[in-house]
Regions:
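P-loop NTPase motor domains
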Residues: 4-305
């Protein structure tokens, strides 16, 4: 006798069909229509851009959704998708309210999520090299937090300009590269000198502790690991996406009727890493939001690809 536990909820569904059988027209479109009518947030990805063209306007104008289109096929025409949006938001709250520990904790949490997703997206075990990757996560978290805290948006003539945000992943790369340079003190690089200037209780100093106590060669290896992971983001086209604030972050996605359309060109394999990183980061941030609401998101969300 066999006993099977069957989950009959309509949570996951996989449709397989040859080209032209109607996977998009007869399956995805009705599901997106149902999702919009039900008021659920959704993330949709495709390689042609048909979903965004045909249903982005419908979702916004007919159902009142906030819509974001991340177009990796034509990045210069895409909405922004700054990976540091939530980190920057909560650091800005901390700057206005220095005693707000909850906001600082959230900034640190989202910085750790981003660092883990960039350094070790697949959750691999690197055996004897595990130390370098763990230390690299700590260094990347520390640099991200410092950037969010001490590099506020640029003001022009006293006014804060929306598109002058300087806190993004490319700035993180530039800062790590500059801090890797040797300092005037022998045996120390600029990163170690910067950490020495921070108060003892500053969390950035704690996150980078394993790297700071390492030998000079090990420290250089850790910093090189961070740089090698960040090299992927150095692309003039992709910077048009990564260097501008997201119109929708994970918290607003979970709280309001929102739709994110991701267009991924199948002929350009170099964009796959960034697409996967966006999905992983959004998923982990949504898990974190759900943890704050008894394991459930305030607004039900779906992923349609």
């Amino acid at each position: 006798r066999l006993t099977a536990l069957v989950d009959c909820d309509d949570i996951h569904c996989l449709m397989i069909g040859a080209s032209g059988v109607g996977k998009t027209a007869y399956f995805l479109y009705p599901n997106i229509e149902y999702t919009c009518a039900s008021g659920m947030s959704f993330f949709a990805s495709d390689t042609k851009g048909d979903l965004a063209r045909n249903y982005g306007t419908i979702a916004r104008d007919c159902y009142g959704y906030q819509v974001s289109v991340v177009d990796l096929r034509n990045p210069t025409k895409s909405d922004g998708y700054n990976l540091l949006t939530l980190i920057n938001h909560y650091m800005d709250v901390c700057r206005r309210e220095p005693t707000n520990l909850a906001a600082r904790a959230k900034a640190e949490k989202y910085a750790k999520i981003l660092s883990k997703t960039i350094i070790n997206p697949d959750g691999e075990n690197f055996a004897q090299n595990q130390y370098f990757y763990d230390a690299a996560e700590g260094v990347l978290t520390a640099v991200t937090l410092l950037l969010a805290e001490y590099l506020p948006p640029k003001r022009i003539h006293g006014e804060l300009r929306e598109r002058r945000e300087r806190r993004h992943i490319v700035s993180v790369f530039k800062l790590v590269q500059e801090l890797l340079a040797p300092s005037i003190l022998p045996g120390k690089n600029e990163f170690q000198l910067l950490m020495d200037r921070l108060p003892e209780e500053h969390k950035a100093k704690w996150f980078s502790g394993s790297a700071l106590t390492a030998a000079e060669q090990s420290m250089a290896s850790v910093m090189s690991t961070v740089l090698s992971r960040l090299n992927t983001f150095l692309d003039s086209e992709l910077e048009q996406v990564l260097c501008f604030d997201s119109t929708i972050d994970a918290e607003s996605f979970a709280a309001k009727k929102s739709s994110i359309f991701q267009i991924l060109p199948e002929e350009d394999q170099t964009k796959n890493f960034l697409a996967g990183l966006m999905i992983q980061t959004l998923s982990r941030e949504l898990f974190s939001v759900a943890d704050e609401h008894d394991g459930k998101l305030p607004c039900r969300a779906m992923s349609l690809s």
